[in-house]
């Protein structure tokens, strides 16, 4: 089964949206295999956003991500990377469709509630940055027989 990394960012945490995010993914049939609530250290933010460190917007992004706690999660399911990106919506909330997390809850591109891995490769890298292998829990949902052919 495919895995992805999701993170409810500080604005989503402060606005009480963790439960909403979890509910949407559970109802879709995906299962959470790891989670942690923490304020991210600078070094890990720089590792996570390594491709953006030299960009002019990075200092603001780093200040925002470290401004409060985040809720980090690893989810598992068939085609979860693509489907989760569709559920999250466009990075810029102005272009995010209604019914997506960002379309329903985000107002600014800089504070857009949630991060989700954009490819299987990125998901594997981000999961390894934030979680040790032994922190990922393997289990079978009772309804899996009704979710997958």
From Swiss-Prot:
<feature type="binding site">
    <location>
        <position position="9"/>
    </location>
    <ligand>
        <name>ATP</name>
    </ligand>
</feature>
<comment type="similarity">
    <text>Belongs to the NDK family.</text>
</comment>
<dbReference type="InterPro" id="IPR023005">
    <property type="entry name" value="Nucleoside_diP_kinase_AS"/>
</dbReference>
<protein>
    <recommendedName>
        <fullName>Nucleoside diphosphate kinase</fullName>
        <ecNumber>2.7.4.6</ecNumber>
    </recommendedName>
</protein>
<dbReference type="GO" id="GO:0046872">
    <property type="term" value="F:metal ion binding"/>
</dbReference>
<keyword id="KW-0597">Phosphoprotein</keyword>
<dbReference type="InterPro" id="IPR034907">
    <property type="entry name" value="NDK-like_dom"/>
</dbReference>
<dbReference type="InterPro" id="IPR036850">
    <property type="entry name" value="NDK-like_dom_sf"/>
</dbReference>
<keyword id="KW-0547">Nucleotide-binding</keyword>
<feature type="binding site">
    <location>
        <position position="85"/>
    </location>
    <ligand>
        <name>ATP</name>
    </ligand>
</feature>
<keyword id="KW-0479">Metal-binding</keyword>
<keyword id="KW-0067">ATP-binding</keyword>
<keyword id="KW-0963">Cytoplasm</keyword>
<keyword id="KW-0808">Transferase</keyword>
<feature type="active site" description="Pros-phosphohistidine intermediate">
    <location>
        <position position="115"/>
    </location>
</feature>
<keyword id="KW-0546">Nucleotide metabolism</keyword>
<dbReference type="GO" id="GO:0004550">
    <property type="term" value="F:nucleoside diphosphate kinase activity"/>
</dbReference>
<feature type="binding site">
    <location>
        <position position="57"/>
    </location>
    <ligand>
        <name>ATP</name>
    </ligand>
</feature>
<keyword id="KW-0460">Magnesium</keyword>
<feature type="binding site">
    <location>
        <position position="112"/>
    </location>
    <ligand>
        <name>ATP</name>
    </ligand>
</feature>
<dbReference type="InterPro" id="IPR001564">
    <property type="entry name" value="Nucleoside_diP_kinase"/>
</dbReference>
<dbReference type="GO" id="GO:0006183">
    <property type="term" value="P:GTP biosynthetic process"/>
</dbReference>
<comment type="function">
    <text>Major role in the synthesis of nucleoside triphosphates other than ATP. The ATP gamma phosphate is transferred to the NDP beta phosphate via a ping-pong mechanism, using a phosphorylated active-site intermediate.</text>
</comment>
<keyword id="KW-0418">Kinase</keyword>
<dbReference type="Pfam" id="PF00334">
    <property type="entry name" value="NDK"/>
</dbReference>
<dbReference type="GO" id="GO:0005737">
    <property type="term" value="C:cytoplasm"/>
</dbReference>
<feature type="binding site">
    <location>
        <position position="91"/>
    </location>
    <ligand>
        <name>ATP</name>
    </ligand>
</feature>
<dbReference type="GO" id="GO:0006241">
    <property type="term" value="P:CTP biosynthetic process"/>
</dbReference>
<dbReference type="GO" id="GO:0006228">
    <property type="term" value="P:UTP biosynthetic process"/>
</dbReference>
<dbReference type="GO" id="GO:0005524">
    <property type="term" value="F:ATP binding"/>
</dbReference>
<feature type="binding site">
    <location>
        <position position="102"/>
    </location>
    <ligand>
        <name>ATP</name>
    </ligand>
</feature>
């Amino acid at each position: 089964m495919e895995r992805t990394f999701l993170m409810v960012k500080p604005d989503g945490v402060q606005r009480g949206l963790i439960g909403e995010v979890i509910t949407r993914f559970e109802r879709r049939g995906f299962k959470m295999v790891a989670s942690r609530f923490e304020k991210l250290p600078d070094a890990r933010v720089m590792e996570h956003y390594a491709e953006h460190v030299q960009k002019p917007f990075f200092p603001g992004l780093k200040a925002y991500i470290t401004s409060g706690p985040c809720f980090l999660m690893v989810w598992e399911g068939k085609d979860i990377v693509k489907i989760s990106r569709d559920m999250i919506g466009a990075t810029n909330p102005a272009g995010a469709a209604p019914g997506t997390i960002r379309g329903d809850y985000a107002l600014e591109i800089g504070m857009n509630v949630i991060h989700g891995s954009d490819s299987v490769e990125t998901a594997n890298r981000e999961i390894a940055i934030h979680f040790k292998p032994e922190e990922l829990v393997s289990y079978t949902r009772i309804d899996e027989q009704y979710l997958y052919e």
